[in-house]
Amino acid sequence: VQNHHVAEIKGGTFNTTGSAQYVVDNEGHNGAANDLGQMTISGGTLNGKIYVVGAGASLAVTGGTFSDPSALLYLSGNANVKIRLNGDATCNGFKTQSGQSVELDLNNHVLTLAKPTVGSAGTETNSCQLLKGSTVTMKNGTLASDNDKIMIQNYCNLTLDAMTVRGLNALYVLSNNCGNILINN
């Protein structure tokens, strides 16, 4: 789905095949009436990379199932989102807000959280910050980061199921400040 104006995806299945690079290509370059790049995704299954470019582009993800973990960078409102990797992947640090629910199924792959890191203003030192009132499940794979501070800063109800959390340089791979953590293997 390439969008230069206004688009909303509420359902359906979208796959990249052949030479297609992106399942979502959302562009808003100059603020002109025909180049807004405003997109909302509230449902559907999207298998492929997400690409958002341009100073005016905005993407709000409130639902759906994605193979690209960068969907986590665009969580909005009371998002209820599933990520299921189809290969090893890298994405920037991400955060969840109160009311959001995320299921991250690594599907026996490695997800590497890269820079930039996230956190509260002035202390953006986390690979992921899971805020109070959100619910997050990570399962079936390896979460990795080269971050030298905190990989997972947790305030939510968090489940780690059949997970390896690898932060060779981290001060902490998991810091729990609020909420309950359930670790299963």
Residue ranges and their predicted role:
Residues 17, 69, 113-114:
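Short capping micro-motif at the N-terminus of alpha-helices
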Residues 1-18, 26-48, 53-65, 77-82, ...:
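Surface-exposed loop/turn motifs in large extracellular/passenger domains
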Residues 83-102, 106-117, 147:
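N-terminal extracellular ligand-recognition/capping segment immediately after the signal peptide
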